[in-house]
From Swiss-Prot:
Transmembrane intervals: 39-59, 81-101, 125-145, 166-186, 201-221, 249-269
Protein's name in the database: Probable aquaporin PIP2-6
Entry keywords, A to Z: Acetylation, Cell membrane, Membrane, Phosphoprotein, Repeat, Transmembrane, Transmembrane helix, Transport
Modified residues (Phosphoserine): S11, S279, S282
Domain comment (free text): Aquaporins contain two tandem repeats each containing three membrane-spanning domains and a pore-forming loop with the signature motif Asn-Pro-Ala (NPA).
Motif NPA 1 positions after renumbering to this chain: 106-108
Compartments, record wording: Cell membrane
Chain's gene name: PIP2-6
Listed GO CC annotations: Golgi apparatus; plasma membrane
N-acetylmethionine modifications at: M1
Amino acid sequence: MTKDELTEEESLSGKDYLDPPPVKTFEVRELKKWSFYRAVIAEFIATLLFLYVTVLTVIGFKSQTDINAGGGACASVGLLGISWAFGGMIFILVYCTAGISGGHINPAVTFGLFLASKVSLVRAVSYMVAQCLGATCGVGLVKVFQSTYYNRYGGGANMLSDGYNVGVGVGAEIIGTFVLVYTVFSATDPKRNARDSHIPVLAPLPIGFSVFMVHLATIPITGTGINPARSFGAAVIYNNQKAWDDQWIFWVGPFVGAAIAAFYHQFVLRAGAMKAYGSVRSQLHELHA
């Protein structure tokens, strides 16, 4: 269907797009489809590659700026380079996997989409497990290939930086994840996609750019989590007490941020609550007519 060919339902509602129906919470029939397992595998591989490239970049940055090892600030990629590595990999991997799994690569994104009824509980849990396993394997490969530098430079693990309290750390993770998940909702909004055929193709770009911008802002505070799988995988392989003590920050913050973004987009910007209220009023009116 082209944008100029409206169905009778669309004409009556005055809409030139169709919202996809909400996904059932318990959609067990997915377990019988190969496309489901293909999507889970895609999430595993994408998260593995994401952690492999980004953690290598972080360790390379720290080794190049280590004065004791003959490095210097001008010899490294800097925070800008690290941010580009994270944002660039998200752009690449979302572009590659969007048509297969939706390109989540992040339990917080999956959680936000689940709350918005975009994915089922079965798919959400499976994605999160695959993402955490992929992240762990990705960091494991980094340790194998960079065994000399891995433990010396912190293993790319997320930890609350000195001088910041827990509240600041959690707040940074909440706001950072809100920016990311809000961008995901906006970039994949069917209303916007219906009006511009280029939007679906370009969606990975703003998503990756949001990751880049959030990293610039929050690397000094928490090292930037906004992705529980990224934080979990690094903590498992690095296995440092402080990394484990701070681990909850990188789950609570992102999940709260994702929940707020889902609520804001669905019930404020898309007026989900008003639509539901209007539907109930219409049904009650028909019953009493």
